[in-house]
Structures are given as structure tokens and as C-alpha cells.
């Protein structure tokens, strides 16, 4: 097997609708430096948030995402040849949208993974030959919004289907040196992963994966390295994605392009910061976000309560934006919202579990986060708490 360096670039979230509708026509959508970074890799993996499918009779809302199939021309310019579609918008346009996306990918000699017409198809790994000892990838999506595929129905590979995930990882490791899990999950707009998300991703490493690359929060989060050389990148943030509801939140206009460099024996990475220029709808380079740093277990334990408090502040902003008449200027209504677990996104011990998040956030009053040595990370999180502390 060839032991020379083999590289893959992973982007953040991509959706050519809302403010990005039609932007695929602009050949200067991305700066030259971004194109150079993308083109420097052997493969480019994008997180495609929505179907390439646009019939006129679809009912569209703030949270609905589907794209004009013509947007594929922008993906070609990026040399994005692998599309991660195991996310909470891949099924917004139903099975027809999913099939359309996969058909367009095949016509453009691109691969898709993470969603399919059945559980078997959704869980099918992508294999990248024998370079660097061989690389295989799967993609998983969180409950409830990533509609889970079954033996006979279309959807995503559910991130809690541990038996199937472990089996696919084992299948990859039989023939490949490296296994990558793309994970679409975690709370939106949170600066750090909640403990149960972090534990789940570490669980994938224990199953045999070497790297986890995360999406869905729409903001960049930290990464974490381990003594055995394995890595988790909790969220790359947005790349080509801009909506009204996201503009209500901090840090949704920045993200990270991640390049993983493989040889048969070693894994390294490079990162490029990107910024969505909302005045003209283009994407440029910027400094790598301060939050995108290696936060080991001891520092995470110090910072997790402050990050949980910041997440609650962001979730409050979200609820006020979505339903201003119910939550705007009404602290009692917000108190009721955060004291219960009856909302539609709740999954016990896995997603939006306020029975876990609220007590963790309340622990921030102990000020142990002030003992963290990561001053820039603390400032990044505190920005979310303007007016809250």
C-alpha cells in the first residue's frame, strides 16, 4: 500500500437556499484562498443540508431546506466529490428529494452517505481505496429530527443505532487503517458539546473509529485529541449557510475548513477559518475561531457549566425569535420552557435534555470555569452571555 500523504477536506454546513439562494452562479462565491485549500486535497467532503430538489408545491418554512439542482455547479467548482447527507434536512423534501439528490450525485461522479432508501443503504460506508492504508467513512444523525431509516423506509443512519454503527466500523477496520465517523448532532449554537454528546462521540472512538467530525450546531466548537492519536472535531460550524433564524445568534457567520492528512502510520490536520460576508453573500478567509482549540478532559470539566449556561442563553434567543408573542419579555414562559422536557426535540439523556443541562448551567455560579487556562475560549463563551451574568 502507498504510504504517501493522503488528504481530505471537510467543510461545515452547506445549503444553497434562503440568503444563499442563487449564489451558486457566482464563480467568486468563495475567495481564491478557500478554493486553493479545497483543491489541495484528494477529496472534499461537504455536509449538504437539504435535497437538490425543488418542486413548486413544497411547503417551505424557516426550518425547511431544499436547493435548486443547478447549485451542483458550485459543488463542482469546489471539487466536492463526497456529500454527507445524514442530517436533519436531507428528508425535508421526502423520499423524492433524497432520490433526486443521490441521482444528481451519481451523474456528477460524486458519492453520498449517511442517508438512503433503506437502513442498509444509509449505513453503507464510503471507501477511499488503499491510500494511507485505506480509509472508510460512515455518517450518523441524531434523534429525533434526522429521520431514521428502517429496513424498508428511507432516512438516515440513527446515531444511537449502536449495534449497526459498531458493525459498520468493524467492517471498515477489517480492510482499512482509518475509520472516520461523520456525526450530525449536538445542540444548536452551543459553544461546547454537552456532556452526553461528548460521551457519545467518545463512544464511537471506543468502537474503533479513529476520527469523529461533527456538524449541526451551526457554530464552530472545540476539538479534542487523545493519547492514542484519535481525534474528535465537535463542530465545524457553517460554510455556505445563511438564514434569518441563524442571524439571531452569535458566531453563525464563521466556521472552519478541516483538512485531515493521513499516512499509513500518522494522522495530522490543518484548519482554515472562514467567514460569511453577509453584506454581499460571499465567503472569505478569517482567523481560525478561538473556540476551535484542543480542550482536554480537565479543561472541559471546568468550562462545561459556563458553556451550558451560554447554550441556554442562545436557546432563549431562539425561542424568542421563533415565537416572540409567547416568549418575548415573558420570563415566566421561558422558565416553564426550560423546566420541562415536553418539547418536540427532547430525547432523554441525548438531546435537549434540560433535566441535565439546567443543573449543569447552574453550577457555573461556583466560578470554577475561572480556573481554566484557556482565556480566549472563556472570552468566546462569555460573549454569548452578554446581559446574562
Specify the residue positions occupied by each region the protein language model found:
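Binuclear metal-dependent hydrolase catalytic cores centered on His/Asp/Glu-rich metal-binding motifs
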Residues: 19-32, 65-66, 129-179, 199, ...
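Active-site environment of divalent metal-dependent phosphoester hydrolases
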Residues: 17-19, 52-55, 88-102, 119-124, ...
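A short C-terminal boundary segment appended to hydrolase-like catalytic domains
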Residues: 249-251, 255-389
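Active-site neighborhood of phospho(di)ester-bond hydrolases with catalytic His/Asp-centered motifs
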Residues: 10-12, 44-49, 78-88, 111-116, ...
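N-terminal catalytic scaffold of extracellular/periplasmic and nuclease hydrolases
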Residues: 1-86, 92-94, 101
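Conserved beta-sheet core of the metallophosphoesterase superfamily
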Residues: 79-82, 195-256
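Active-site-proximal segments of metal-dependent phosphoesterases and phosphodiesterases across multiple
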Residues: 55-76, 178-210
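Short acidic, glycine-rich surface-loop motifs adjacent to enzyme active sites
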Residues: 41-52, 169-192
Amino acid at each position: 500500500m502507498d504510504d504517501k500523504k493522503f488528504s481530505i477536506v471537510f467543510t461545515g454546513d452547506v445549503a444553497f437556499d434562503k440568503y444563499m439562494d442563487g449564489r451558486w452562479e457566482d464563480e467568486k462565491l468563495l475567495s481564491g484562498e478557500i478554493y486553493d485549500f479545497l483543491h489541495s486535497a484528494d477529496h472534499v467532503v461537504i455536509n449538504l443540508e437539504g435535497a437538490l430538489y425543488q418542486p413548486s408545491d413544497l411547503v417551505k418554512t424557516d426550518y425547511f431546506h431544499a436547493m435548486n439542482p443547478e447549485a451542483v455547479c458550485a459543488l463542482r467548482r469546489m471539487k466536492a466529490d463526497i456529500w454527507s447527507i445524514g442530517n436533519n434536512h436531507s428528508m425535508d423534501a421526502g423520499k423524492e428529494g433524497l432520490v433526486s439528490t443521490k441521482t444528481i450525485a451519481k451523474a456528477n461522479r460524486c458519492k453520498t452517505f449517511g442517508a438512503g432508501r433503506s437502513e442498509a443503504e444509509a449505513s453503507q460506508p464510503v471507501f477511499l481505496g488503499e491510500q494511507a492504508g485505506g480509509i472508510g467513512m460512515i455518517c450518523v444523525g441524531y434523534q429525533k429530527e434526522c429521520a431514521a431509516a428502517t429496513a424498508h423506509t428511507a432516512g438516515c443512519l440513527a446515531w444511537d443505532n449502536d449495534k449497526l454503527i459498531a458493525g459498520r466500523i468493524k467492517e471498515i477496520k477489517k480492510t482499512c487503517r482509518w475509520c472516520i465517523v461523520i456525526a450530525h448532532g449536538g445542540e444548536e449554537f452551543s459553544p461546547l458539546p454537552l456532556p452526553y454528546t461528548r460521551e457519545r462521540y467518545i463512544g464511537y472512538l471506543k468502537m474503533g473509529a479513529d476520527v469523529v467530525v461533527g456538524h449541526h450546531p451551526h457554530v464552530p466548537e472545540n476539538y479534542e485529541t487523545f493519547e492514542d492519536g484519535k481525534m474528535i472535531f465537535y463542530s465545524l460550524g457553517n460554510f455556505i449557510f445563511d438564514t434569518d433564524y441563524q442571524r439571531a445568534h452569535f458566531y453563525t457567520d464563521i466556521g472552519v475548513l478541516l483538512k485531515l492528512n493521513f499516512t499509513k502510520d500518522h494522522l495530522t490536520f490543518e484548519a482554515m477559518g472562514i467567514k460569511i460576508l453577509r453584506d454581499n453573500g460571499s465567503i472569505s478567509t478569517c482567523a481560525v475561531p478561538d473556540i476551535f482549540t484542543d480542550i482536554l478532559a480537565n479543561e472541559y470539566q471546568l468550562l462545561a457549566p459556563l458553556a451550558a449556561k451560554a447554550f441556554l442563553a442562545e436557546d432563549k434567543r431562539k425561542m424568542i425569535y421563533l415565537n416572540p408573542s409567547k416568549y418575548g419579555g415573558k420570563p415566566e414562559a421561558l422558565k416553564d420552557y426550560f423546566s420541562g422536557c415536553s418539547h418536540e426535540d427532547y430525547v432523554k439523556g441525548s438531546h435537549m435534555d434540560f433535566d441535565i443541562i439546567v443543573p449543569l448551567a447552574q453550577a457555573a455560579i461556583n466560578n470554577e470555569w475561572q480556573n481554566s487556562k484557556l482565556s480566549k475560549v472563556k472570552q468566546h463563551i462569555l460573549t454569548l452571555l452578554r446581559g446574562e451574568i
